[in-house]
UniProtKB/Swiss-Prot annotation:
Keywords: Acyltransferase, Cell cycle, Metal-binding, Nucleus, Transferase, Zinc, Zinc-finger. Residues 1-38 are annotated as: Disordered. This is N-acetyltransferase ECO1. It is found in: Nucleus. It comes from Yarrowia lipolytica (strain CLIB 122 / E 150). It is an enzyme of class 2 (transferase).
Length: 271
């Protein structure tokens, strides 16, 4: 037993020389390591060299394309405002030119109108057709009303579920409209001074928007639409002109209202 302990001690002291070049103390013949474990250590040492351990893989940054300027900026002003339709656009930019061409045609001639089940014919002749629609969310109607608000520089109107629009169509283009709604009260306005009276009057129909395309103005379209709305808006009831009021009328709208009604009365939307 003493001899065995001394041998273990001797082998432990010579553990540092296990991987020396001496044949008698090689890993394959060392009594401290099993043969299989020694072979695995040798293969692992051969598989990964110190140079490979120190080597670092450096990734090249991805190349990004520089932004390309589509138009030259030489300090000159390239935008212009059309005196006819009022649109501002870039004269040297193709998409702007196309957009102006489309908008210009729409502003002068009116947008294309496609008859649908949401609109009914209330008047028709050889030259025009008047449609009435209460479905203001219909794409054809809503797009036209957006154009009207843009042309009049007016916000989105506050309307009830009883609102209706009368559209004047010529050659399948909507060239004019009157947007009306049910109201209950109004006030008199002095055209000369712009003073709003304090006294309230009963009213039935409120005119929220009046619009005619540029090429069709001064042809009596708005007057025609107001007359139709006055007799058609409330089923079975012919309204008097003093039962009709207007909201947010422009300078031209005030003149039209005065010529049509004589005395102009106004109301506030949502009241």
């Amino acid at each position: 037993m003493k001899t065995y302990r001394a041998k273990r001690k001797y082998l432990s002291e010579s553990e540092d020389d296990v991987f020396s070049s001496s044949p008698t103390q090689s890993p394959e013949t060392s009594p401290l390591q099993p043969p299989n474990e020694s072979r695995l250590n040798i293969k692992a040492a051969q598989a990964v060299s110190p140079c490979q351990k120190r080597a670092k893989v450096v990734k090249k940054p991805a190349k990004t394309k520089a932004p390309v300027q589509m138009t030259l900026s030489l300090g000159q002003t390239t935008s212009t405002t059309c005196k006819t339709c009022g649109m501002t656009y870039q004269v040297a930019y193709g998409p702007d030119i196309s957009a102006h061409k489309s908008f210009h045609s729409t502003a002068l001639n009116g947008p294309k109108w496609k008859p649908s089940v949401s609109a009914v014919v209330v008047d028709k002749s050889k030259t025009y057709t008047v449609y009435k629609s209460r479905l203001l969310s219909h794409p054809c109607v809503s797009q036209f009303l957006k154009l009207v608000n843009s042309e009049l520089n007016a916000p989105e109107p506050i309307l009830s579920s009883q609102a209706a629009v009368y559209v004047y169509v010529v050659d399948q283009r909507a060239v004019g409209c009157v947007l009306v709604d049910r109201i209950t009260k109004c006030r008199h306005v002095d055209i000369q001074t712009g003073t709003l009276g304090l006294k309230e009057y009963p009213a039935v129909m409120g005119v929220s928007r009046m619009y005619v395309s540029q090429l069709f103005r001064r042809t009596g379209i708005v007057t025609k639409l107001l007359d139709l709305a006055k007799s058609d808006f409330i089923y079975g009831m012919e309204l008097e002109k003093n039962q009709v009021a207007f909201t947010q009328p422009s300078e031209g709208g005030l003149k039209v209202a005065e010529n049509w009604a004589g005395t102009v009365r106004v109301y506030r939307e949502g009241e």
